[in-house]
Amino acid sequence: VEKEFETGHWLHFAAVYDGQYLRLYLDGEQIHFVETRNGGTINLSMAYDGHTWEDTFAIGRSAGYARFFDGYISECRVWNVARTTAELEDGICYVDPTSEGLISYWRFDGETQEDGTVLDMTGHGHNAKPYGDITYVDNQKCPF
């Protein structure tokens, strides 16, 4: 994506894959799309089946695991349905953890288990394990 992102304030970023197209959204507006080569489903099973850190689904690092996100991530959600633009806009600030199609929902607000685990708010058990030196920022209000 050839877009400069303004820093110093919160952004809502979403990626939606419908089996043919990958669409990227910023604050509810589509900013990029690309047709995928082979289509089909995306396999995220490595996120939950105990592979080594280098092989797992990760939030805030590149697939090559050498580059890490430099900023704050308030929440992350994984759906097994392609969300519409209207659904993305409606869910920018809040989504019901029991919503149909929501398979993982993590809030990075400092509410963790004793071992640092961030609980999956959906109840599906896809809990997240922080890696490295994590700083949590609590009491953030959705600016949208």
Question: Locations of the language-model features?
Answer:
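Extracellular glycan-interaction patches encoded by glycine-rich segments
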Residues: 47-75, 83-91
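Extracellular glycan-interaction surfaces
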Residues: 1-44, 63, 131-144
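Extracellular/lumenal carbohydrate-interaction signature centered on repeated Trp-anchored short motifs
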Residues: 2-11, 16, 49-53, 65-72, ...
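Extracellular beta-strand elements of beta-rich domains used
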Residues: 13, 73-78, 120
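Extracellular/lumenal ectodomain signal focusing on beta-strand-rich modules
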Residues: 12, 56, 75, 104-105, ...
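Acidic glycine-/aspartate-rich tracts in secreted/extracellular proteins
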Residues: 19-21, 29-30, 63-64, 78-87, ...
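Extracytoplasmic low-complexity segments
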Residues: 48, 89-144
